[in-house]
UniProtKB/Swiss-Prot annotation:
Phylogenetic placement of the source organism: Bacteria, Pseudomonadati, Pseudomonadota, Gammaproteobacteria, Enterobacterales
Organism for this UniProt entry: Erwinia tasmaniensis (strain DSM 17950 / CFBP 7177 / CIP 109463 / NCPPB 4357 / Et1/99)
Residue span(s) of domain Sm: 9-68
Residue spans of biased composition, Low complexity class: 70-102
Recorded GO MF terms: RNA binding
Region (Disordered): 63-102
Record InterPro entries: Hfq (IPR005001), LSM_dom_sf (IPR010920), Sm (IPR047575)
Any one GO biological process: regulation of RNA stability
Protein name: RNA-binding protein Hfq
Function: RNA chaperone that binds small regulatory RNA (sRNAs) and mRNAs to facilitate mRNA translational regulation in response to envelope stress, environmental stress and changes in metabolite concentrations. Also binds with high specificity to tRNAs.
Quaternary structure and partners: Homohexamer.
Amino acid sequence: MAKGQSLQDPFLNALRRERVPVSIYLVNGIKLQGQIESFDQFVILLKNTVSQMVYKHAISTVVPSRPVSHHSNNTGGGSNNYHHGSSPAPSSQPQQDSADAE
């Protein structure tokens, strides 16, 4: 599996498995809506009233209608390369470089 697919595949698979409605925005600005029926390295099959084959190179953004957990299959305590969405809380006071203080 290519490194670029290590986030893509679990995310898309969770959307497919849980039948989450998605909005897919294409690079030309068109918005498609439906459920991910299946996907491979190059395309996503999007099902609404009809099934559409959407080439991944034409996709700008995939927006789920609700949050999904795409890393739940990682039961080990070890770290992985997935970004879990948590980041350190910002400091309550702005920090200033000593060179900037006057």
